């Protein structure tokens, strides 16, 4: 079944999902203001809407968007899959293609493609140049960004980078961000050519890094180099206290040594 513009699909997500087709914007706005439709999902498009009963999905084409409460998904093409076994036709997944983006009350992100699992409350953004932002800063990845809303975890894969609002940058091949219940960063774990750059320009590099937001400190492991201007420390492990500015270089368990190179005093 195909519907040409103007037209709108309404689908209530999860247990209370209902499907309706509304053809006038004024009716949509009136419906959205009523408590009856408070949890409904509204899907609209510029060009057309298709209902594929065989494969159980609705297809919005041309500047498509899906809106439910404070959640919004946009793309050139959008497919909303539903569970055909339920009378309510519960929406279980949304696949968006072409300049895809999402936004909720705390985060927004974009990529070439987007896949949202409604039951797991998980967004998958595919690159190149996928990005996501939240209360503490923004992140980017060349391949994939996975945002697990229920677990409050963000995973960035390949050429990943985080820019925090306090001026710090962190990059690596893989970065995992853990949020607290207020959507602020609690912990960051990074692996693969990790670089941490401070607001003052000092840098630390390592194979892996684990940043503790509450303690404002990081544990760096594997080929660690901490550099501040002409001062450089090298070793297998390092503890960096960002609050005090103290960096402690530690040797590995095999008996390796740590080293330091310092600016020569002026004569």
Residue ranges and their predicted role:
Residues 1-267:
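Mature-chain termini and adjacent capping regions
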């Amino acid at each position: 079944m195909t519907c040409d513009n103007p037209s709108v699909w309404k689908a209530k997500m999860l247990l209370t999902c209902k499907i309706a087709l509304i053809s006038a914007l004024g009716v949509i706005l009136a419906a959205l203001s009523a408590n009856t439709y408070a949890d409904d999902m509204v899907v609209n498009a510029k060009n057309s809407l298709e209902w594929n009963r065989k494969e159980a999905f609705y297809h919005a084409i041309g500047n498509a968007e899906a809106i439910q409460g404070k959640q919004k998904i946009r793309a050139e093409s959008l497919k909303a899959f539903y569970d055909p076994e339920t009378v309510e036709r519960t929406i279980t997944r949304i696949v968006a293609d072409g300049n895809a983006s999402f936004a909720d009350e705390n985060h927004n992100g974009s990529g070439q493609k987007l896949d949202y699992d409604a039951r797991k409350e998980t967004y998958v953004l595919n690159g190149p140049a996928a990005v996501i932002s939240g209360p503490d800063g923004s992140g980017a990845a060349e391949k994939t960004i996975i945002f697990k809303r229920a677990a409050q975890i963000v995973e960035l894969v390949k050429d990943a980078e985080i820019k925090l609002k306090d001026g710090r940058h962190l990059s690596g091949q893989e970065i995992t961000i853990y949020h607290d219940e207020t959507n602020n960063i609690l912990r960051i774990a990074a692996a693969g050519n990790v670089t941490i750059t401070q607001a003052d320009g000092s840098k630390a590099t390592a194979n892996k890094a684990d940043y503790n937001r509450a303690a404002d400190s990081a544990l760096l492991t594997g080929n660690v180099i901490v550099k501040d201007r002409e001062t450089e420390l090298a070793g297998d492990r390092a503890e960096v206290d960002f609050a005090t500015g103290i960096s402690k270089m530690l040797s590995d368990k095999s008996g390796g040594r740590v080293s330091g190179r310092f600016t020569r005093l002026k004569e």
